[in-house]
Amino acid sequence: GADLITFHIEVHPDPVAHAKDLKNMGIKTGISLNPSTDVERVLPYLEHFDLLLVMSVNPGFGGQSFIESVIPKIESARMHIDKHNLSTLIEIDGGIDENRAQRVVDAGVDILVIGSSFFGAADREAFTKQVQSLKR
């Protein structure tokens, strides 16, 4: 079964209650933030979540271009997590290639979702090693 369930803050009226229900079932929780949503909307809830998923493309289909305006959102979330000594991880999904990977890691991302760039890489092994070597 699922060990972690992530849901979008934009569609859930009471994210904390939902997170508590999931945690009571032994499931880790994640909350997702769409590119157009203000990061301030999710910050007050991070203490209740194991993961913040920042969408860097609009949800729906692969191969979209990275939306640059998510970088300051990542930085704000990382500052909030560090300031409050939270264990919440930051994951990013959408438009991540070998050039953007280091930028988002520098901004505070812990987990990268990479699809099109990996599958389109001429040398997937080299691509994977490059991404694995990234350090904040």
Describe these PLM feature segments.
Residues 1, 108, 115:
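Active-site-proximal glycine-rich helix-loop-beta segment
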Residues 2-89:
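Conserved anion-binding
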Residues 7, 114-115:
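Short beta-strand and adjacent tight-turn residues that come in two discontinuous sequence segments
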Residues 31, 113-114:
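Hydrophobic residues in well-ordered beta-strands that form the structural core
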Residues 37-49, 94-112:
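Catalytic cores of alpha/beta
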Residues 58-60, 95-99, 118-119:
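Short Gly/Pro-enriched loop/turn and capping motifs at secondary-structure junctions
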Residues 105, 119-136:
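C-terminal helical cap(s) of enzyme catalytic domains, especially alpha/beta-barrels
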